[in-house]
């Protein structure tokens, strides 16, 4: 998610520098992916807390624990929430056929190049077997939150605030 936000944020910042008065940016951008697929959003707090808790267990040495979200997040949920945080509209996930009908724009080609590694996650259905981690964390109070618009806004908002602060 953070790579997607950073790539999009960089494009939006260039636009906003040229047109500083713009609020909501309309950016017609087709991104290769499927709304029906999922991404595995995992808050860093959950990962750190889970790592610390599992590392304290004597029986965890040498084991593999996937600190993943047991309920993957549909692309149709996270994309509009991230766009809202970035104050942008017009971004949509499309299949490869969309680019056969109308070739990529320069911006789409640049964005695709920046996101090349991550496209596999936008198109595929990544599944992580997190049963060992869930078993190890049972009755500890450490649980990965279900991704809602509110949680995604918090995660994405934090990162956008960080990027904005760096460019000051």
Where is each model-derived feature located?
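A hydrophobic C-terminal alpha-helical subdomain
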Residues: 11-31, 97-143
């Amino acid at each position: 998610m953070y790579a997607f936000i950073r790539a999009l944020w960089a494009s939006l910042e260039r636009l906003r520098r040229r047109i500083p008065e713009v609020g909501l940016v309309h950016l017609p951008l087709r991104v290769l992916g499927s709304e029906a697929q999922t991404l595995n959003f995992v808050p860093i707090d959950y990962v750190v807390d889970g790592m610390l808790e599992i590392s304290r267990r004597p029986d965890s040495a040498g084991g593999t624990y996937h600190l993943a979200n047991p309920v993957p997040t549909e692309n149709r949920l996270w994309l509009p929430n991230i766009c809202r945080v970035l104050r942008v509209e017009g971004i949509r996930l499309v299949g490869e056929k969309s680019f056969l009908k109308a070739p990529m724009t320069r911006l789409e080609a640049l964005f695709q190049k920046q996101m090349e590694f991550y496209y596999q996650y936008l198109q595929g259905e990544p599944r992580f077997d997190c049963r060992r981690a869930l078993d190890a964390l049972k009755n500890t109070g450490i649980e990965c939150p279900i991704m809602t618009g509110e949680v995604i806004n918090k995660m994405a908002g934090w990162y956008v605030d960080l990027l904005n602060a760096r460019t000051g």
